Amino acid sequence: MQESKLKVIAGALLHDIGKPAYRGDKSKNHSISGYEFLNDTVGIKDTEILEQVKYHHKNMIQNSSIADNSLAYITYIADNIASGADRRKVDENQGFDMDMQLESVFNILNGNNQHYKYKPQTMENGINYPIENEISFSKEIYKKICDDIADCLKGIDENNSEYINSLLEVMEADCSFVPSSTSKNEIADISLYDHCKITAAVGSCIIDYLEQEGITNYKDELYNNSKQFYSKKAFLMYSFDISGIQDFIYTISAKGSLKLLRSRSFYLEMLCEHLI
């Protein structure tokens, strides 16, 4: 994988890392909080990654002096696309609630009107079943999440191609139960991990498109003319059918059946993890 694409994926995965830091210390916006967290606490000095974290919102970009080919423009529009896909608005309430929990995606499925929420925790605490009780996402919990992320990222070399896999593991472990948005005007059932992963996926597609088309001025293409970009055929969606997979899993001999069942189930899980 090309170095520029690796940096887009890394920057996109980390672009909202300032949200846990900001919610734990509300003195700055989350873009600045994320930049300072990675630069000062974690020790990441790669400018191309840091720019994506600091300048992924319009109000930050328009007052910046970043280059026309900065990868920040890719993460900026990838974030907008991912946000458009995962934000479903409700009609009531305004403002933000920094203590908001992540809601279950099943709350509104099939016309449901439920209020199950996940306990604020990391994946190291085991299976987190949604509950109806209110447990606020305290400043202390956000601090623990930031400390865990910092400890893990400090031991990772961002110049190594394995960095992305390690980064995905860290984000999944610590941000799977952190809401991406704490706006009272949105349904908070998308985790920060899922949002960042979608942003990284979209960003990796965009850089492939730009390189294929020979486009080097990312500012003009993705920022100044962002509305026109949305109508371009920059993405290719594909699907695959694994119906009948049950036969593969369950058609096994009696001898060692439990071991075979577990291994085939694990194989399927890894296949989905790799493809999705």
Residue ranges of model-derived segments:
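Extended, Lys/Arg-enriched charged tracts that mediate electrostatic binding to polyanionic substrates
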Residues: D194-E213
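Divalent metal-dependent catalytic cores for phosphoryl transfer on phosphate-bearing substrates
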Residues: M1-P130, V178-T182, Y230, Y250-A254
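Amphipathic alpha-helical segments in well-structured domains
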Residues: S27-Y35, C196, S265-E269
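Surface-exposed, low-hydrophobicity interaction/linker segments
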Residues: K255-I276
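Extended, charge-enriched "interface" segments that sit outside catalytic cores
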Residues: T122-A188
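Conserved structural-core and active-site-/substrate-pathway-adjacent residues in large, well-folded domains
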Residues: A12-H15, D79, T199, D241, ...
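Catalytic-site or vestigial catalytic-site microsegments of nucleotide-handling domains
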Residues: M237-D247
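A short, charged/proline- and glycine-enriched loop
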Residues: K232-F235
